[in-house]
Amino acid sequence: MSDHQNRGQDFSLEADSELRFEIEQKDAKVLVTLVNGFAELFGTELVKKKKYEFGMGAKVAIFTYQGCVLHVTGKMDVCYISKETPMVQYVNCHAALEQFRTEAEEKDRRGPVAMVVGPTDVGKSTLCRILLNYAVRVGRRPLYADLDVGQGAIAISGNVATILIERPASVEEGFPKTAPLVYHFGHKSPSGNSVLYNAVVSKMAEVTLQSLNGNKRTKSSGIIVNTCGWVKGHGYAHLLHAARAYGACAIFVLDQERLYNELLRDVPSSVHVVLLPKSGGVVERSKELRHECRDQRIKEYFYGNARAPFYPFSFEVKFQELRLYKIGAPPLPDSCMPIGMKAEDNKTKVVAVTPTPALIHHVLALSFAESVDDDVIGTNIAGFCCVTEVDMERQVVMLLSPQPRPLPPNALLLWSELQFMDNHT
């Protein structure tokens, strides 16, 4: 590191501007300190004189409404100040949602359900984070529903999930992932099984909307829904399905006029559809980077991070004790289906999986369902484990798990296409 990087640099930001930087180097570390003024990261206020640490993969945009001075130390691949920022429009969206919440509170009704939609890499997760942070800063307790199975902001990829947001996100680590409601999907894109995807979205929407009635504060706070970046063809149909399932009253469309006009045409006129610009700081991610991000999320699930390391367990399970299933059977023509069944029904069929070496590295979901006779699709997930070894001779699999052996009684494991190479040393 050069002397300049060691000493750091002061950045003076005018009102309504932001400091943007990216870190791509694997072992790079950047420290940011708010020297004076007021600033925030995606809706979370920075504390003066406190050092914030960012590592590889960080794409940071620190915004100020009033002006501030930031001290930055470390090696960044990109770093600049921008006065072109959509933050004022985003805070206007928050203000509109607050009007809905106030009205809901007065009339004891459900608060607003707002969906954030748009193609990949336009900042959907970031806008959700901003809206959620602003909501809790004024005393709300909204729910955050994440339907993006490709990246996963709450659970690991391949799942849909919901959490209650009670405090602003940590600047460095985002929202705490405590007590999420997670439903298994098992694929990195809704295209992996469109019928199943709609089924789990419907189930999570049903359970989430019911849960609002249990707490008056949360009921009036409503839900922010994050979505996948697949917005054409079947992907667009999934967006419409989610909007109906959640009863969305507002849809924020990021950076695509075509999608905005399609939604204006296809959703009820009572739904507020708003076109918003993406931030100039949003960066397009390569296929490789997306894969790395998915891998990192799974690694953090098992091993934590430098600030809060976890120590997972490895243990063997005999084939005969392994109750492993997959949701979705190979497609068959209607002529080969049992009477009364359609080919679509096969997409939600629960089928047994025989352990083979092909199972190595696959992530498995541990369902709260106790039997395949239960509603497996409609039952949420307790956690995840990963197959690190399959010994055909001894008829055992080796599992990496956050919990020690044994597996819970009647444990029902669900296959997913997600894989994780456990190279942790």
Swiss-Prot record:
Matches recorded under Gene3D superfamilies: Clp1, DNA binding domain, P-loop containing nucleotide triphosphate hydrolases, Pre-mRNA cleavage complex subunit Clp1, C-terminal domain
GO aspect biological process, one term: tRNA splicing, via endonucleolytic cleavage and ligation
Superkingdom, taxonomy of origin: Eukaryota
A GO MF term: polynucleotide 5'-hydroxyl-kinase activity
Positions contributing to ATP binding: 18, 59, 121-126
UniProt keywords, alphabetically: ATP-binding, mRNA processing, Nucleotide-binding, Nucleus
Keyword Hydrolase: no
One term under GO cellular component: tRNA-intron endonuclease complex
InterPro entries per record: Clp1 (IPR028606), Clp1/Grc3 (IPR045116), Clp1_C (IPR010655), Clp1_C_sf (IPR038238), Clp1_N (IPR032324), Clp1_N_sf (IPR038239), CLP1_P (IPR032319), P-loop_NTPase (IPR027417)
UniProt-listed Pfam families: Clp1 (PF06807), CLP1_N (PF16573), CLP1_P (PF16575)
The keyword Nucleotide-binding is annotated on this UniProt entry: yes
Localization annotation: Nucleus
Family classification: Belongs to the Clp1 family. Clp1 subfamily.
Role, per record: Required for endonucleolytic cleavage during polyadenylation-dependent pre-mRNA 3'-end formation.
Protein name: Protein CLP1 homolog
Lineage, highest ranks first: Eukaryota, Metazoa, Ecdysozoa, Arthropoda, Hexapoda
